[in-house]
């Protein structure tokens, strides 16, 4: 590097001007004192350009001008003049509008070497080399620069600690992808600092904290790409991480594949909800109730076939583009999504950053939730005032109809943020400053609204303001005008999880080991068990079944005994059937041979719950027909062939005595 030999025009001219004026007026003894005082002021002004505890490095030939340097060059502060030293740092000095070399005067590392210093100018002490930054070794309790190289010190960090990097003369911690940052130099794994977050460049994805080219993952059939990994598909009722895993018309809710609206879970399959009078394991074909059939079994109509199969030549078969696996038809497209996409209901959708446009919450990254077609972060570490709401970790004022907005959470009076303006949604109109429905609109609120007291109100995510419990999403409750998770549960990806011990609140019901709010007639629902007053969850609304009407919050009617397929007739009323563990009023409601005890469907004494059926160990012998034996799993329980594949030389058949599908084997050893 070239040394700067010219004097600093700023300090040098000032000193010269003052010196010549004083020579004419001040006696020599006083002049000598003033000279040293001015020299001290000059040195202090230069030293102040270095961090605390450090001193500017001057060349032997020019004491007025510190050595300049290049921040990216670790050797730029080392020269053959003898004034340069190992272990200096390159610091920007505003006085010179340039970078200058700064060093520690500590002599623990020798006369021509400065020990490693922190950003505050403190000498880094050590007992082993591992405590020193790259290019330094521990010597006499201090981290000293390596001087045994012909290319100066090999230290690339210019004096920062291990795990730090130098940015404009300051030491900053190196951070992983997804962490907060101030400069790209901090970001590891080939990422960049964008919006104060270390992120991969466009066209790259994060794989094990390394940015790699986003060319998609080639996952095998039966698996799906998620977070740059191939994960196994999951059937209804099984645990899941994302809805892209879930098959057979199910989505991932509360970490379990749950049947979509208008479908019900029947022994591992999502079966459409119909108004027929058949049992839940049957469907109506030509006015006759016939058993449902899995892949490979006989059929007479498509509606018999479950698991995505179709009736072809009298047998339930998978259509073109699908393969029979685990008793389901698996689409070959399930593994064709790129790593920056997710599979939702058999379609590939791009993942979306917080603030981007979305259709499903599964698209949103960083555990955000798709609210009003925008990925909204559920994470808020800031505390907002009472007239503000937190959106994507920032505080925004609540605003009235007609005002500019960032998200619908800001909008008051049931308005929504449409085109960045709080407006009344379609189907509502402004009346006295509030968005109200048009003559009830036949109960047709928007998909992100709920009907309460003949008015449409926006649904609300956890952590946002509410007026009624029915507005709160994710099983949260409206407490202190805020949707919050009830005691004993926590917010996990926008859903309140907990209550697995069956101890739900009095206004909740246990479904799939989770607590869900009970819902009155006319309000939104996910499961029939939520609906009160003998109503049913139809089109995501608790409604009275055909033939009955709402009388004081209770569905009355149906005296002809024609209840729906998921109901039972008792005392001139239709009651919803409920699985084991759910709330009940009468035993006739309880499925799987359970009984209504203490308002819950429970297995009677001497029996246990096996695949949602109360059974005894001795009762499994008569599940198959004469001359056949039931096949048991590793826990000595009958195999549910709608969930697991039957072993060799066995077959899947419906057991009328057990009211379920089991694997049976002929005692003669021949397959059926």
UniProtKB/Swiss-Prot annotation:
Q: Name one GO cellular component term.
A: membrane
The family database entries (InterPro entries) matched by this protein are listed as: Cys_repeat_1, EB_dom
Give yes or no: UniProt keyword Transmembrane.
Answer: yes
Please name the Pfam families in this protein's record.
EB (PF01683)
Q: Which UniProt keywords apply?
A: Membrane, Transmembrane, Transmembrane helix
- Reply yes or no: does the keyword Nuclease apply: no
Topology versus the membrane:
Single-pass membrane protein
According to the record, the segments passing through the membrane are: 26-46
Where is this gene product found? Membrane
Task: State the protein's name.
Answer: Prion-like-(Q/N-rich) domain-bearing protein 25
Encoding gene, per UniProt annotation: pqn-25
């Amino acid at each position: 590097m070239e040394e700067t030999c010219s004097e600093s025009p700023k300090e040098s001219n000032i000193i010269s001007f003052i010196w010549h004026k004083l020579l004419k007026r001040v006696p020599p003894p006083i002049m000598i004192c003033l000279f040293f005082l001015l020299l001290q002021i000059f040195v202090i002004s230069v030293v102040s350009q270095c961090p605390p505890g450090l001193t500017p490095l001057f060349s032997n030939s020019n004491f007025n001008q510190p050595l300049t340097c290049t921040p990216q060059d670790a050797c730029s502060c080392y020269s053959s003049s003898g004034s340069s030293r190992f272990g200096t740092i390159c610091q920007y000095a505003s006085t010179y509008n340039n970078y200058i070399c700064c060093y520690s005067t500590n002599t623990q590392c020798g006369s021509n070497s400065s020990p490693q210093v922190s950003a505050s100018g403190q000498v880094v002490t050590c007992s082993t080399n591992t405590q020193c930054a790259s290019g330094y070794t521990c010597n006499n309790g201090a981290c000293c620069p390596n001087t045994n190289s012909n290319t100066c010190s090999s230290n690339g960090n210019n004096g920062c600690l291990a795990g730090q990097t130098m940015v404009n003369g300051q030491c900053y911690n190196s951070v992983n992808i997804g962490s907060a940052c101030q400069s790209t130099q901090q970001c590891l794994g080939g990422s960049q600092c964008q919006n104060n977050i270390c992120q991969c460049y466009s066209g790259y994805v994060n794989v094990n904290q390394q940015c790699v080219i986003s060319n998609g993952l080639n996952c095998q059939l039966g698996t799906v790409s998620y977070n740059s990994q191939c994960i196994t598909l999951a059937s209804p009722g099984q645990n899941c991480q994302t809805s892209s895993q879930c098959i057979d018309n199910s989505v991932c809710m509360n970490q379990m594949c749950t049947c979509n609206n208008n479908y019900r879970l029947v022994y591992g399959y999502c079966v459409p909800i119909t108004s027929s009078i058949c049992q839940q394991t049957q469907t109506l074909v030509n006015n006759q109730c016939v058993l449902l059939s899995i892949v490979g079994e006989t059929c007479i109509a498509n509606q018999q076939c479950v698991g995505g199969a179709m009736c072809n030549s009298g047998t339930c078969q998978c259509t073109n583009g699908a393969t029979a696996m685990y008793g389901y038809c698996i689409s070959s497209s399930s593994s064709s999504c790129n790593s920056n996409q997710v599979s939702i209901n058999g379609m590939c959708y791009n993942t979306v950053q917080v603030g981007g446009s979305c259709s499903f919450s599964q698209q949103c990254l960083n555990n955000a939730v798709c609210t009003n077609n925008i990925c909204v972060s559920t994470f808020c570490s800031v505390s907002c005032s009472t007239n503000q709401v937190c959106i994507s970790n920032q505080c925004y004022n609540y605003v009235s109809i007609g005002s500019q907005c960032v998200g619908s959470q800001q909008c008051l009076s049931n308005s929504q943020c449409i085109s960045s303006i709080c407006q009344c949604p379609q189907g509502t109109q402004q009346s006295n400053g509030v968005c109200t429905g048009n003559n009830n609109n036949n109960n047709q609120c928007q998909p992100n609204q709920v009907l309460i007291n003949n008015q449409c109100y926006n649904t609300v995510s956890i952590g946002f303001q509410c007026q009624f419990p029915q507005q709160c999403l994710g099983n949260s409750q409206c407490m202190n005008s805020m949707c919050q998770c009830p005691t004993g549960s926590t917010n996990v990806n926008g859903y309140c999880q907990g209550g697995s011990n069956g101890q739900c609140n009095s206004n909740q019901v246990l479904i799939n080991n989770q607590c869900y709010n009970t819902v009155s007639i006319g309000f939104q629902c996910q499961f029939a068990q939520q609906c009160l007053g003998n109503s049913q969850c139809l089109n995501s609304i608790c409604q009275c079944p055909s033939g009955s009407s709402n009388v004081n919050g209770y569905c009355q009617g149906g005296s002809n005994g024609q209840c729906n397929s998921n109901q039972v007739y008792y005392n001139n009323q239709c009651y919803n059937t409920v699985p084991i563990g759910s709330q009940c009023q009468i035993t006739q409601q309880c499925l799987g041979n359970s009984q209504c005890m203490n308002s819950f469907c429970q297995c009677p004494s001497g029996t246990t719950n096996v695949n949602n059926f109360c059974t005894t160990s001795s009762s499994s012998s008569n599940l198959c027909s004469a001359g056949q034996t039931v096949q048991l799993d590793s826990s000595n329980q009958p195999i549910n062939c709608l969930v697991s594949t039957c072993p060799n030389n066995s077959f899947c058949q419906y057991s009328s005595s057990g009211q379920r599908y089991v694997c049976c084997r002929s005692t003669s050893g021949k397959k059926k």
